[in-house]
Amino acid sequence: MAASSSLSTLSHHQTLLSHPKTHLPTTPASSLLVPTTSSKVNGVLLKSTSSSRRLRVGSASAVVRAAAVEALESTDIDQLVEKSVNTIRFLAIDAVEKANSGHPGLPMGCAPMGHILYDEIMRYNPKNPYWFNRDRFVLSAGHGCMLQYALLHLAGYDSVLEEDLKTFRQWGSRIPGHPENFETPGVEVTTGPLGQGIANAVGLALAEKHLAARFNKPDAEIVDHYTYVILGDGCQMEGIAQEACSLAGHWGLGKLIAFYDDNHISIDGDTAIAFTESVDLRFEALGWHVIWVKNGNTGYDEIRAAIKEAKTVTDKPTLIKVTTTIGFGSPNKSNSYSVHGSALGSKEVEATRQNLGWPYEPFHVPEEVKKHWSRHTPEGASLEAEWNTKFAEYEKKYPEDATEFKSITTGEFPAGWEKALPTYTPETPGDATRNLSQQCLNALAKVIPGLLGGSADLASSNMTLLKMFGDFRRTHRKKETFRFGVREHGMGAICNGICLHSPGFVPYCATFFVFTDYMRGAMRISALSEAGVIYVMTHDSIGLGEDGPTHQPIEALSKFPAMPNILMLRPADGNETAGSYKVAVENRKTPSILALSRKKLPNLPGTSIEGVEKGGYTITDNSSGNKPDVILIGTGSELEIAAKAGDELRKEGKAVRVVSFVSWELFEKQSDEYKESVLPSDVTARVSIEAGSTFGWHKIVGSKGKAIGIDKFGASAPAGKIYQEYGITVEAVVEAAKSVC
């Protein structure tokens, strides 16, 4: 949080360091390199490193510049900064040591970056971690989370007190082994799986860019914040990072500033064993501005100058490559994989204390450091109060825009929004549920200000175009439709970031259902981080036909019920599609998957929005006393087959109940009484019909029932022929029903 320091003895130097908008004059940077032999820098013993790691990176067209810094004399503030940085290092060391588990290397190497961001640059209110216009910070290299916890503690967040630091990685702790937004206020997104964090950060920056273009006025700028990221070599290797960073450059997200912790160490050893590309040139090719900080260990002014330069580049994101030493200060383990993922050990901790001149007990914060950081609480409150005053004026001048803005920032949707959803009758012409989905999306876009999203280069197949809006582009940032390209994994993670930016955002993303395999990592993080992304997944079965088994998601319907906190919804017609959207929009802390058909389906008697909310419900029943002869259970496109089979069985005098099973998860949440009313336990004659794997269905049909499905890969042929050959037919259901009742 940028603000002036309370240290009255400091001169102009203090202002230069503490205020982000101060313009520092720049002079050519000196080459501050980690020595190539064992020596000391600023009194700290360092292990030898390979000088080739520190060479300038060049290309035919340009050389990636090092950050330009101003030569400043050492003052009291330098000593305070050094003590503050070492406080961060030792809080991390001590917490990992006490837990005997964790990753001390990154916090030790990245402490200077973290200090400058949280103490000098970022704007936030520690007592209100959810203040809208705060700067966002994402630790994409989530294993180094003690860096962020130490920073939150120093900054005055109530979520990380001293006693919390002592419970790191323990049962019931508020500071788990990787950052979790739902556990620790001040943590924006859940990170840990490498690459997810930088992709989430792209989503956060995209949300800021969209809101700024949509709501800022020439006389009223109410959206103005940055997204800062620290990512490591591992993140850089992940494909999801490439996907998301490609889009960030394409969209020109100028308020995204990423610090690349260039320490050249992976779990298996030096990154030279597997990672030798020029990250600098790759990011330049992606459309990023690139700066190199050659001394991330002690080059505080280099880091400050890099941030200052990054903020002058408004038309593209910035990557600041910061060359650091992992485990900086550890005389025997720094610059090695041994400091990455395990405690230093008592002897090395003591040696590090000696090496860095740290005489304090574990978890101690020196008084001068505590006093220095304490200013963030009143200054954060002041920043928020100033913004509130500005927004109050905005609300008077632009009441309609303010109402939409508040819906997005508070998560309070307009009253009666669900009434905008279309309704259908059996007389309504049938259609594919992907087409019905587009009708619902466009209806909701008119009443929910925060609804936005896009497709992975399949918008015309997924039917996800918002007809009343255009495409979000570098020059058209007000628009709500995003073109993600063929980047499924990045798309999902970007939508997580959008969702977690503000509670009223309702992001959706779309592709073929089979390609959830490409984005499952992001979908799992959606579920874990309570991000209510809507996944619009079309072409949900063999019903897509001729494209064949590579595109037919035989196993997809059965794999997601195993994932906690995610809703799978497979609607059968228009009313069920509308009901699925109602459920998905209402569940802002649970992601939803809508599995939608390519084939045209009729609007069936008995379906309803209210039924979908129960997960499973009866659509037709000619039995009495809750004692049908047989229960037919269908989902999606196979509910029509179940309904027709029920009609045939009734002609033969059978009492048949047909149940639509839209969502296992929603059905499981219902009362025992309700579940018994739909699937009475004494009726064991049950048949399920779904054009996918039968895995899991015996939990529903029981040992005496039958599950009709597909337990092998599909085939390339017209949809009707495949259904016939695989036995997903009315005749097969009738035969199965007769065999069990």
From Swiss-Prot:
E.C. no: 2.2.1.1
Binding site for Mg(2+): D233, N263, I265
Residue positions binding thiamine diphosphate: H143, G192, P193, L194, G234, N263, H340, E488, F515
SUPFAM superfamilies, alphabetized: Thiamin diphosphate-binding fold (THDP-binding) (SSF52518), TK C-terminal domain-like (SSF52922)
InterPro entries: THDP-binding, Transketo_C/PFOR_II, Transketolase-like_C_2, Transketolase-like_Pyr-bd, Transketolase_bac-like, Transketolase_CS, Transketolase_fam, Transketolase_N
Keyword Metal-binding set for record: yes
Protein name (Swiss-Prot/TrEMBL): Transketolase, chloroplastic
Organism: Spinacia oleracea
Highest classification ranks of the organism: Eukaryota, Viridiplantae, Streptophyta, Embryophyta, Tracheophyta
